[in-house]
Amino acid sequence: MVKVTRNFAMDTLPEDRFFIEKAIALAYEGMRKGAGGPFGALVVREGKILGEGHNQVIGDNDPTAHAEIVAIRNACRDLRHFQLEGCTIYCSSEPCPMCMGAIYWARPERIVFATSHQDAAQYAQFDDQFIYDELKLSREERKIHAAQLLREEGLKLFAEWRGMDGKRLY
């Protein structure tokens, strides 16, 4: 099997620099007002900013209020749609595992970021490596205990969902 290596520096567009600079400015804004860590993000389609956000974990006491998720929520609310086809998400830093999950669910076309997750660990003390490591382990090996209970009841819920008319898949 041949390993494909992409040169992401060549995957950028002329307007990317403008929007990355804006994401970094949002990160400074949130950080300086004490809302959270040094992270900012934008959702852009066809040169128009649809949603933006900075990290608000501390200000909102919400561990999910990362810049990317705030920007996605704002864009989806304003678009009145839960997916971001044709959009680019610009981030001051490479998204963490939680944010990558949200980004994949939102289905944008691309992501552009300034610093890597390794940079965030080395220079800003935001180290997500333990999450990447945990996700590779079985449920039994993970640090946070996970127990399965009432599977049959859960399957009944899924059966009703499958039989529903008019549901919107995502």
Show where each model-derived region lies.
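A short, polar/acidic, helix/strand-boundary loop motif
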Residues: 13, 57-58
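Short beta->alpha transition motifs characteristic of CBS
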Residues: 50-57
